[in-house]
Amino acid sequence: RITGVKLAEGAEYTTTTTGGDNLAGYINEPDNFYDDNTLDYQNPDPDNTQFPTKDTDKWPNTTGDTSSTFLIGGINGGKVAPGEELEYTIYYLSSGELEANNVLFCDRVPDTVTFIPNSFNNGTPGNGGLSGADRGIMLLKDGSEQALTNVADGDIARYFPPGIEPSTVYPTIKCDGANTNGAVEVNLGNLPNATAPGTPNTSYGYIRFKGKVK
């Protein structure tokens, strides 16, 4: 079982929203069961697509629902202007009782932004990435960050431009809708289940990309 939390981490020039939220810190969202280590949702409704699985208390560096140095950001990015950049981070955790096998991640780029292809060109390249290719996807996996390319090459990520469905390459992938504005795909492979918060470090990580406000 994979638990995921998607958060925005602020505009290009500020990390504080117009409502006063600090997107450079931890924000507990009362309507999100999964963004803390408090077990308050243990009998999920299988028909609830927003909260389909049990809650977890295995996020790293997270204390209850009061603090976290891992789950940084919020779901409300505040008021932004065209041309500004937003950074999106999807935190993942293998939170089940068994290893999660053949994990394929897909996230559609929000309709209000345009994917920035070279956001992480200065990051540490991932293994197998094409030399000289733009790197617009950042991955934390197995305790290390790696900047991944947008193209089909030897690394484990790919950006699909609008109109090209990831399912044409990965028939079983689920992106929750048509690819109308771009989609980010990462092949995470097998993820061992977390046995304690942050243990093992191969059980959790994050995927990050940036978009420019239209």
Q: Where are the model-predicted features located?
A:
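Exported/extracytosolic protein signature
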Residues: 1-214
